Amino acid sequence: MDRQPERENDELPSPAIISDRVLVNGVVTPLTLTAEGELRSTESGRRKSTLAKEILSFVVEGNKVRVKTLVEKGGGICCRGSAGDYARNDFVFEPLSDESRKLWSDKFHQHLVSLGRPKKLLVFVNPFGGKKTARKIFQEEVKPLFEDANIQLEIQETKYQLHAKEIVRSMDVSKYDGIVCVSGDGILVEVVNGLLEREDWKTAIKLPIGMVPAGSGNGMIKSLLEPVGLPCSATSATISIIRGRTRSLDVATISQGTTKFFSVLMLAWGLVADIDIESEKFRWMGSARFDIYGLQRIICLRQYHGRILFVPAPGFESYGQRASCSIDKEPSGSDKTLVYQGPDSKLENLDWREMKGPFVSVWLHNVPWGAENTLAAPDAKFSDGFLDLIVMKDCPKLALLSLMTKLSDGTHVQSPYASYLKVKAFVLEPGARIDEPDKEGIIDSDGEVLARGRKSYKCDQKALMSYDKLQISVDQGLATLFSPE
């Protein structure tokens, strides 16, 4: 005789959606799905559970129900992985009646739908970034998880620089629940700029963007995963996307006349920019190129003339000297389109302060991590409406060398030779080198050259902006990211 589903509410942390006795490995076992999404069973007198975040999907196979899960560190209802590892496992049970099986299927489906997980994603894979392993990472680690979670994928390999930006500018955003970048940070930057160059940018920029580390930088995904104790891995990143949770992200608009660039990571001028860009000549060294060329740049230290102006966040008004700031405005006859023009703020009416050179380094950050091993701005927040500014002026070479070795844990900002503050708006007026006045520097934003000064590295190559005054303003929470919490 078929057994009807019944509720068993003893010691449950939340009400049961469904509770019944089922067969697990041939043994009749109580099984409960709670309103919090916890799947609980008892085998051999020992209670086990799988949290909702571990369940990828389910499938009915004849008389049985297969629950596909991803668990970590030995937890979960069926995990046999070692500590610190993720393990993909199937938990299989057999309801004792057709009615019970249908009810389990309906309740599982309703619960997964209620979580708001993505159903279809546009995935960019950059096969040229970093160690050129993005294609392999996607096929072996990322795609199988998305398939187990029943997420439809439209896959696009990028073929050249700005390819992703071109696609995003013209695609039908209503077809997707999000965009995924299997790459370093570069494709993310292209996607954000593409979304903001659309006439429907107000809707488009709210499309969640997910990152899977497969490049040389990976600062954004490191900033997302590190605070919750997750490793910066493709698996951790993918499961965060599958769960569908999101968070807002500030976007900085860098302007020079009518030219604009939308930044989500950082801007650098001076030492950090020189190391980042000029070390490309040693790319064959891998990540060691930054350390080796960084040492060379410290030994042969450059300082730059210039001036920076900024609007400090509350609590940072003591930095710099009070100053007036002339904000560049677009010519009245400029071609105004419906695309995003930057935050609507009256910058000239704000309380501006200034610092004058010489400068060793000027570094602005939107998120804590600049790369997987560089905690550039430990106090940076994703959507506080401010950029974190790190300024180094006069600094002995030995002290600078010590300071640079502390980038991995963020303690470099505690150095007496570093000023660390938060700003709402920023103006950079870059100048020439102190020791070689006929040479200028490089302005680097989000890993790409924004401007090349006179006689700088590869100065003959075209850049988006000129080596001159530029201004930056922040639009709080403009973009949206898939996030682990």
UniProtKB/Swiss-Prot annotation:
Sorted alphabetically, the Gene Ontology cellular component annotations on this record are: plant-type vacuole; plant-type vacuole membrane
Q: What is its EC number?
A: 2.7.1.91
Entries under Pfam families matching the protein: DAGK_cat (PF00781), YegS_C (PF19279)
Q: Where in the cell is it found?
A: Vacuole membrane
Q: Would you kindly state one Gene Ontology biological process term found in this protein's UniProt entry?
A: seed germination
The coenzyme or cofactor needed here is: Mg(2+)
Catalytic residue list? D185 (proton donor/acceptor)
The name on file for this protein is: Sphingosine kinase 1
Q: Which organism is it from?
A: Arabidopsis thaliana
At the highest ranks, the source species' classification is: Eukaryota, Viridiplantae, Streptophyta, Embryophyta, Tracheophyta
**Gene from which this protein is expressed:** SPHK1
